[in-house]
């Protein structure tokens, strides 16, 4: 009874903090409050509080249920939110190198935590006895590695998507054409002395615009390089987790069902996802290929992860149907 009450308290605390942080993020996005009051730093601290709240929630549920809390969709979502919070905290405490990971990890943790604790999964938070197939020491190894892999791959893929958005965004200034038109117009209407004065003034304005465009494009280039740098490293880490998760799942399947691979829907989509990110890593090793190509592959992998993660849960079929929406 005590553990159940504590679990509900931690759930409400984490969800309340997440809601406040989400509100702060929307306000800072709309009216740029971070320059006025410093709300953005407060939202980062809110994610840290949420991390400890989710950690306490997982440990409480572990003690209360008697097994590692990864037996259904609700628990896996909480663990996925916890994984995003870890990545966010690494970015938060590593302030010597300025990066933009928190712009990806914080909203991701917020929405996943909000979905997991919302009324959409009101039947799933109740802890239940594990089915015989899940009563194994491989549960912690296999599922935790898969969820950590999902979290890292989703984060890296979102960084790649952001890279594509920034790369294909139209930046070319129209100042050049306007100045050329003004120059010919003034040349026809004014005398040489007047035109010389105006032309000098326009040259100064043009030089200022060139400097502004150069600094903006330089910052844009630096941002693209940083997104590519972090996405490659996070996806590489997630690929390792995913590989370990698939291999441990194969060993577990052999012990339970007598076969390493059964082409279950979840297994099939996990293999497809693994192949896509293997292609991504192969592309990154080729220096002659642009970063845009690898970012496109990572964007495809982003969709495949959600299909792999939610597809079987929505259908409720196959050997992994115990984690579906309909199973509880």
Swiss-Prot record:
What membrane topology does the UniProt entry give?
Multi-pass membrane protein
Query: Where the protein is mainly located, per its record?
Result: plastid
Transmembrane parts of this sequence = 13-33, 46-66, 73-93, 101-121, 146-166, 234-254, 263-283, 295-315
List the GO cellular component terms. chloroplast thylakoid membrane; plasma membrane
Biological process per Gene Ontology, one example term: cytochrome complex assembly
Record's Pfam families? Cytochrom_C_asm (PF01578)
What is the annotated role of this protein in its UniProt record?
Required during biogenesis of c-type cytochromes (cytochrome c6 and cytochrome f) at the step of heme attachment.
Subunit architecture: May interact with Ccs1.
| Protein name (database record) | Cytochrome c biogenesis protein CcsA
**From which organism does this entry originate?**
Barbarea verna
Give the classification, highest ranks: Eukaryota, Viridiplantae, Streptophyta, Embryophyta, Tracheophyta
